[in-house]
Each structure stands twice: as C-alpha cells, then as structure tokens.
Amino acid sequence: MPNRRDFLKTAAFATLGSGIAVSQVLAGESIASTIHINKQGMGGKMKMTFFPYELKLRHVFTVATYSRTTTPDVQVEIEYEGVTGYGEASMPPYLGETVESVMNFLKKVNLEQFSDPFQLEDILSYVDSLSPKDTAAKAAVDIALHDLVGKLLGAPWHKIWGLNKEKTPSTTFTIGIDTPDVVRAKTKECADRFNILKVKLGRDNDKEMIETIRSVTDLPIAIDANQGWKDRQYALDM
C-alpha cells in the first residue's frame, strides 16, 4: 500500500490536465483556491529566498526576567512553478538563536538539487542533516515546504492528512506581566477568541495578575512563572 507521500504525488499528477481539483480527489469536495497546478507537468526546481524583519508587538511583553517590545524574525519563501510557500523563524531571546544564526544556516540550504517538492521526507532529512541545532531555521523551511505542497494540491493540510479540524486541540493566548489596566485590556482583546489563557507570573504582583484576569473572564488559566518562583511555599500558596 503506498504511503501518504506517494499518494499525494500520484493524486497531483493524476489530475493534471483534467478539470478535477486535487482537493476533490482528497476530500470529495471542492475547495476554493486561486492556486492551480502547472498543467504542463512538474519538472522545475525549487528556489528558496529569505530575509529578516522585526515583528513589533502590540503590547510590551514582560515575563519574570525581562521585557521586550519586538521579536526578531526571518521569513522564508520557497518558489516552485510560480507557486510560493511561506515559512517563518521566530527567535525569542531564551532559545539562543539569532537572526544571524538563522541566516547563516539558511545560506547552507540548497533546494535547487530537488525537482520534486512532494519528496518531503527526503528534503527535510537533508535540511536536518546540515546542523544538529538551528531548530528555528529548520522549522521555517519545514513550514514553507508544507505551505508550498498544500498550495500545489489546492487543499489545506488538515484535509490532506484526513484530520477533523473541529477536533484541533485548543491553544493558549499568553498574557504578559503588566499593570491591572493593561492586563484587563489584553484579556478583553482575546477572551472571545481563545479557550485557554496562559499567564506570565514570577514578580510581586502575581496575585493581582490573576485577580485582574478573573474580573474579566472565567476562562481556564495556565500559568508560567519562567523560573521566577524561588520559594517552594510561595509556589504552593499560589
């Protein structure tokens, strides 16, 4: 029985030149898309470009040990047959990766040696072999490649993988340490869009943070003190 990678490739080629969308083969229904597979067949080379940029945060982001207003990022674009997939490497300071380290890693990546973007396992194994670290840079290539293949197929990945998007696990929205007024505003901004909140603690206003959030919403709360709690009893009391 062919594996999913081979099935994806077979589905793509089987529908070339026909009036059937690959998404119909995968899911039995039409998925609106402005991207179409090259009807002359697939035989080009992938081209990867990347550039750094700075993501400006809406609010100051404060945890137990530091504050920041920006996050350094590197965007990765993989182009194939006129279709482009996008990925991103985000480098918060505690992960030890920088724009420079990501750029240096990406300069080593040569995707032009691959003529078939559907060879996901081979391509990503090659990327992983270039360094034992550099996980943010590798993730950016991984995301861009999957985005590219999804666009070539004209289907979202939950359809390609046969997943029910209604069963997607809930993710959290993080609220950084701040004054009561700002915490209240942050909570109101996200309370109707997320099912769980993650709250940064680890300073003198921990209880005030929780009380302020509880004055706005009763959503479940997960807490992250970022090594800010040094006393066991204090942690137990919280």
Residue ranges and their predicted role:
Residues 22-58:
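C-terminal segment of N-terminal export signals and the immediately downstream linker at the start
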Residues 157-238:
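Metal-dependent enolase-superfamily TIM-barrel catalytic cores that perform enediolate-based chemistry
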Residues 41-44, 63, 155-166:
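N-terminal amphipathic alpha-helix/helix-capping segment at the start of soluble metabolic enzymes
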Residues 1-8, 32:
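Twin-arginine (Tat) signal peptide motif
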Residues 70-73:
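Short catalytic helix/loop segments, enriched in acidic residues and glycine
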Residues 6-28:
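N-terminal export signals
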Residues 9, 138, 198-200:
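A general lysine-centric signal
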